[in-house]
Amino acid sequence: MDTFGLKIISSDRVFYEGRCRKMIVPVPDGGGMEILPHHEDMVIAVVIGEAMLQFEEGEWVNLAVGAGFLEIVNNRVTMLVQTAEKPEDIDARLAQEQMEYAEEKLRQKQSI
């Protein structure tokens, strides 16, 4: 089965670099965009959500991704996102603290 080159870069590291059969990324219209080998060259906005990757061996992996963009050129995909994590690597306590901090900041702005 055909594959494409994939490189996922988050703000703090290269998350993945290798071959991929298929990927589905969250896009602004609320859905997901599927990318297959030999996809037309383009740039796509990526929103916070779940991305799904099917590696060369056929294994599917789900990722939590932050906002960013994805570029497809000559059967190579580069995704630049704020964050990229496997669900099992997410620290639930830290995520809750960050959400509470963000909600407090929003409340402070609304009360001005």
PLM segments and residue spans:
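Compact, glycine-rich, soluble single-domain proteins
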Residues: 7-97, 101
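Short structural boundary motif marking the start of a folded domain
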Residues: 2-5
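Helix-termini ("caps") and immediately adjacent flexible loops/tails
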Residues: 102-112
